[in-house]
Amino acid sequence: MEEIQRYLQPDRSQQHNFLYPLIFQEYIYALAHDHGLNRNRSILLENPGYNNKLSFLIVKRLITRMYQQNHFLISTNDSNKNEFLGCNKSLYSQMISEGFAFIVEIPFSLRLISSLSSFEGKKIFKSHNLRSIHSTFPFLEDNFSHLNYVLDILIPYPVHLEILVQTLRYWVKDASSLHLLRFFLHEYWNLNSLITSKKPGYSFSKKKQRFFFFLYNSYVYECESTFVFLRNQSSHLRSTSFGALLERIYFYGKIERLIEVFAKDFQVTLCLFKDPFMHYVRYQGKSILASKGTFLLMNKWKFYLVNFWQCHFSLCFHTGRIHINQLSNHSRDFMGYLSSVRLNSSMVRSQMLENSFLINNAIKKFDTLVPIIPLIGSLAKANFCTVLGHPISKPVWSDLSDSDIIDRFGRICKNLFHYYSGSSKKKTLYRIKYILRLSCARTLARKHKSTVRAFLKRSGSELLEEFLTSEEQVLSLTFPRASSNLWGVYRSRIWYLDIFCINDLANYQ
């Protein structure tokens, strides 16, 4: 074990070779393959996306055969067949990518474990459930009192495979490992199969998500490195909430450090952004940067980011991918929410000797609303209602049992309430619940060849209870006669950490 720890030291990973020796060390494969080590609660071995059937010994043999193959014997007619493997090429490329991703994650995951253990003296487990989407929750709760403009940014996508390889050059000092990665990418994939940019964001092959997410996270980290550096230059940006809400933007943990070359190249430019007081968040392939100042200052921010990405990544980044919007009169589609800034008036009484004054302070906060029109469009597309929001029956579910029909409708309703629990006004959600409940009743009435009124009279409160959310169930059991408590809960915003993707109905196109 001492020999293993010597190779897995996080501090040594940037000074010595770690990928190439790991690939050809037998005990590393035993360490990765022995699932009895789950008792140590390792983040790597508890990752739910890890393939339990992956054999690292086969990965090692495939890498060796990949180097020893004769390229003149490869058939050019069949892109999915490879003679040196004698089997499906994509299957073995998937195994190599899984093994490569597992090994390359070891130093960064160990760094996260050490940072979690040192944070306030508490050891945090199950941190792999915290993702970059969870960083949007504190952003929506921020106070924007002094902010006037926002930058809506589309993160530039890598136009060549070499850019993905070069983003790792600061982390991986092993040239052999970079050559292996470059050879592997060019041998098994082309650019079109690696990344598609039809929508804002990125779409990866489901079979190789772990490997490509690692490459994409390393690339995004380089894109966001300027924000980390500027944050460290300002005392206003020192936040204490990063330890509680870790995100996977910076290799599964918040790394508040930037390579020295950036400080040398952009020290002169930083004088333009003294005391920026900025708020930043990223979701999917888009990001938002809010800062105080005038339109001229935000325009400087815009050209600074464009020049930074063009110089650092050697790619053509158009200024049209960054839009400057005024914070007070601009709403945006944010993770399925319709977000806009709301002004809350706060009256403060100040008394000085015999005189008293009333001071009215306007506080800017994000108002997260449920978009009713896109949601009704999603329900209409799924045949739950018409485009005008009138509930209709679901004929394709008529062959199911009554309990299955009620369970499906109730589960959709609960998932929507769960996802939109952070909404500041939930009146729209009750309209969605009404549509789903009446659509369920129409489907059951159609199945039993009865009217909706007769079916509801016969079923009683059984159908109503299936559409109660978890919060409503708890309050109904604790305070059966206090309906005002239920209204108080739904006026507040609740964020759940088990939300790690955008709801399908909320992602209506």
From Swiss-Prot:
Matching InterPro entries: Domain_X, Maturase_MatK, Maturase_MatK_N
Keywords: Chloroplast, mRNA processing, Plastid, RNA-binding, tRNA processing
KW RNA-binding (keyword) present: yes
GO molecular function: RNA binding
GO biological process, one term: mRNA processing
Primary site of residence: plastid
GO terms under cellular component: chloroplast
UniProt-annotated location(s): Plastid, Chloroplast
Pfam families the UniProt entry points to: Intron_maturas2, MatK_N
Keyword field contains RNA-binding: yes
PANTHER family hit by this protein: MATURASE K
Family: Belongs to the intron maturase 2 family. MatK subfamily.
Protein's job: Usually encoded in the trnK tRNA gene intron. Probably assists in splicing its own and other chloroplast group II introns.
Listed name of the protein: Maturase K
Organism: Nicotiana tomentosiformis (Tobacco)
